[in-house]
C-alpha cells in the first residue's frame, strides 16, 4: 500500500511543506514541496487565517496518511511566540482532518538523515536530495526542512 507523508516546517512568515509517498517496495517519491507565505504587513489574525485556509487546501490535495512536524523548542522570545501561534493553527487543522502526527526535533532529523545530530543545513539538504533522487538541492530552505521531516517520518514508521 502506498503511504503519503506530509512534512511541515512551522513558521508564521513562511511555512514549509513537502509531500512524499512511500511505495510498497519502500521506494520514495516526491509529490511536491514549497511554502505557504504570509505578508509581514498584515495583522496576525489574517496571517494565521491564511495558514489555516492554505493548509486545509494542501491536506485536501495531498490527502496524507501521516504528517511530520518539527517539535517546538524555544528560539528568541518574539519569534517563539509567533511560531507557537502558527503551530497552534497547524495542530488545529490536523486535528480537524483526524491525521496521525509525528514530531521530531531538529537533532532527530539530522541524526536520521546524516548519521549525526549536529549536521549543518547543507548536509541535511544533500541527504534529502540523495534520498529523494532530486536533480538539485530543494529550495527554499523551509521546503527542504519540510521534506527532511517527511523523510525522517518515512524511516521511523
Curated annotation (Swiss-Prot):
UniProt-annotated binding residues for Mg(2+) 2: 70
Transmembrane segments: none
Catalytic residues in the record: 9, 70, 142
Residues binding Mg(2+) 1, per UniProt: 9, 142
CDD domains documented for this protein: RuvC
UniProt entry keywords in alphabetical sequence: Cytoplasm, DNA damage, DNA recombination, DNA repair, DNA-binding, Endonuclease, Hydrolase, Magnesium, Metal-binding, Nuclease
Annotated localization: Cytoplasm
EC numbers, comma separated: 3.1.21.10
Gene3D superfamilies: Ribonuclease H-like superfamily/Ribonuclease H (3.30.420.10)
GO biological process terms, semicolon-separated: DNA recombination; DNA repair
Keyword DNA-binding: yes
Short name of any one Pfam family annotated for the protein: RuvC
Family annotation (PANTHER family): CROSSOVER JUNCTION ENDODEOXYRIBONUCLEASE RUVC
HAMAP family: RuvC
Similarity comment: Belongs to the RuvC family.
Subunit structure and binding partners: Homodimer which binds Holliday junction (HJ) DNA. The HJ becomes 2-fold symmetrical on binding to RuvC with unstacked arms; it has a different conformation from HJ DNA in complex with RuvA. In the full resolvosome a probable DNA-RuvA(4)-RuvB(12)-RuvC(2) complex forms which resolves the HJ.
Chain's role: The RuvA-RuvB-RuvC complex processes Holliday junction (HJ) DNA during genetic recombination and DNA repair. Endonuclease that resolves HJ intermediates. Cleaves cruciform DNA by making single-stranded nicks across the HJ at symmetrical positions within the homologous arms, yielding a 5'-phosphate and a 3'-hydroxyl group; requires a central core of homology in the junction. The consensus cleavage sequence is 5'-(A/T)TT(C/G)-3'. Cleavage occurs on the 3'-side of the TT dinucleotide at the point of strand exchange.
Designated name of the protein: Crossover junction endodeoxyribonuclease RuvC
Organism: Cyanothece sp. (strain PCC 7425 / ATCC 29141)
Amino acid at each position: 500500500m502506498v503511504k503519503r507523508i506530509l512534512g511541515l516546517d512551522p513558521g508564521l512568515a513562511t511555512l514549509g511543506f513537502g509531500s512524499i509517498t512511500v511505495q510498497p517496495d519502500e521506494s520514495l517519491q516526491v509529490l511536491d514541496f514549497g511554502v505557504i507565505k504570509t505578508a509581514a504587513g498584515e495583522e496576525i489574525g489574517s496571517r494565521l487565517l491564511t495558514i489555516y485556509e492554505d493548509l486545509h487546501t494542501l491536506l485536501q490535495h495531498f490527502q496524507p496518511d501521516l504528517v511530520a512536524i518539527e517539535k517546538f523548542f524555544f528560539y528568541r522570545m518574539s519569534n517563539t511566540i509567533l511560531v507557537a501561534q502558527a503551530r497552534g493553527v497547524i495542530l488545529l487543522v490536523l486535528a480537524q482532518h483526524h491525521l496521525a502526527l509525528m514530531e521530531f526535533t531538529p537533532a532527530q532529523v539530522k541524526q536520521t538523515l546524516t548519521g549525526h545530530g549536529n549536521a549543518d543545513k547543507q548536509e541535511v539538504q544533500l541527504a534529502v536530495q540523495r534520498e529523494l533522487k532530486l536533480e538539485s538541492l530543494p529550495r527554499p530552505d523551509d521546503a527542504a526542512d519540510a521534506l527532511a521531516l517527511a523523510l525522517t517520518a518515512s524511516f521511523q514508521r
